[in-house]
Each structure stands twice: as structure tokens, then as C-alpha cells.
Amino acid sequence: KVFERCELARTLKELGLDGYKGVSLANWLCLTKWESSYNTKATNYNPGSESTDYGIFQINSKFWCNDGKTPNAVDGCHVSCSELMENNIAKAVACAKQIVSEQGITAWVAWKSHCRDHDVSSYVEGCTL
């Protein structure tokens, strides 16, 4: 599923991400825009670590989810990677909460590149929240 911006903003807010660990909803929207273009089915393979990033948050199979094929995987969120690509993003959000709790928002390269030190207010502008 490819979310519309405001639809995703409302969904992330309902699932408790707005202000979670001090990270604003606008920052989560910026992160997901640059990681996956709001697409739950996004995947990207990383040849160096032989791992794959999954779903709207591009959660990595080396550390956080189990795809059954990544060498020396940890499965920190105790979730199958395929579950992170479901239209219902509750499991993906739960894992993102765990990641930000353990590592902070800087765990996401796209956030560091595109959102940190930027005005991210436009990501929630015009959305009825």
C-alpha cells in the first residue's frame, strides 16, 4: 500500500508515534517519505551485509526482523520481515518504536540526510490530525 501523506500522518498519530521519544510526527513523515515514499511494500537489498530493508520504515533484516535468509541476523523486533510490509502498519510502527528507543532517530540514514536540521513542518501541513 502506498499511503497518502495525510492518511499516513493520521495513522502514525493513531498508533502513538507523534512525539514518541521526542520525535515529532512531521519528522516521522519526513523519514518515511525518504525511506520508502510511504510505500509499505518497499524493499532494498544491501549487498555488503547481505541484508534487506523492509517496508515503510525500511527496517533492516540484519538487526530487526527475520526474513530467513540474512546471515547472522538478530531479529531484535521478533517479527518476520514480511509482516513489516503489511497494509496494516501496526507491527512496523511497534518495531520502529523499539528502534528509536534503543538507537534514536539517527538509526535512519534518510532522516540524517534529509530531515535533520530541516524545516519538516510541510510534511504535516494541511492535514487534519
Curated annotation (Swiss-Prot):
CDD domains: LYZ_C. Disulfide bonds join C6-C127, C30-C115, C65-C81, C77-C95. GO terms for biological process: defense response to Gram-negative bacterium; defense response to Gram-positive bacterium; digestion; killing of cells of another organism. Residues 1-129 form the C-type lysozyme domain. It catalyses: Hydrolysis of (1->4)-beta-linkages between N-acetylmuramic acid and N-acetyl-D-glucosamine residues in a peptidoglycan and between N-acetyl-D-glucosamine residues in chitodextrins. InterPro entries: Glyco_hydro_22, Glyco_hydro_22_CS, Glyco_hydro_22_lys, Lysozyme-like_dom_sf. Pfam families: Lys. Its EC number is 3.2.1.17. The active site is at E35, D53. It is an enzyme of class 3 (hydrolase). It comes from the Eukaryota. Lysozymes have primarily a bacteriolytic function; those in tissues and body fluids are associated with the monocyte-macrophage system and enhance the activity of immunoagents. Belongs to the glycosyl hydrolase 22 family. Monomer. Lysozyme C is capable of both hydrolysis and transglycosylation; it also shows a slight esterase activity. It acts rapidly on both peptide-substituted and unsubstituted peptidoglycan, and slowly on chitin oligosaccharides. This is Lysozyme C-2.
